[in-house]
Amino acid sequence: MAIFLSAITAPTWAQFTGQGAQVATPTVAEILAKPVDGQMVRVQGHLLSKIKSETYTFSDGTGEIVMEIDDDDFPKQPVSEKTKIEVVGEVDTGLRRPPEIEAESVRVLP
C-alpha cells in the first residue's frame, strides 16, 4: 500500500512541449524589426535608464527597447547601467507604440 501511495504522490516534472514552449534568443534589433506579440524571448544586455515605476530602457548593443519589470522580478543585488543582465520575457506589441518586453525573470550575469 505504501508503494502505491508514493507512486501516486510522487512529484512529476512534465513540461509543455507545444507551440510557444521554446524561448527565442533574438537581438533587440530583430525584435523591433519583426515583433511577434506573445513571443517568449531571452535577451542579454543592460538597463540604461528608469522611465517610471517598473519601466526601463534596455539595450543589448543592437538597439533599445522598453522593458516592464515588476519589482518582485527584480534581482536582489543592485543593478546599474553597467550591470549585465539576462531577461526572459514576453514581447508585447501595441497599435500606437513600439514593441516592449514584459519581463518574467531577470538575473544578473557574472
Say what each PLM segment does.
Residues 1-8:
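Bacterial N-terminal signal peptides
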Residues 10-110:
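OB-fold and OB-like single-stranded nucleic-acid-recognition modules
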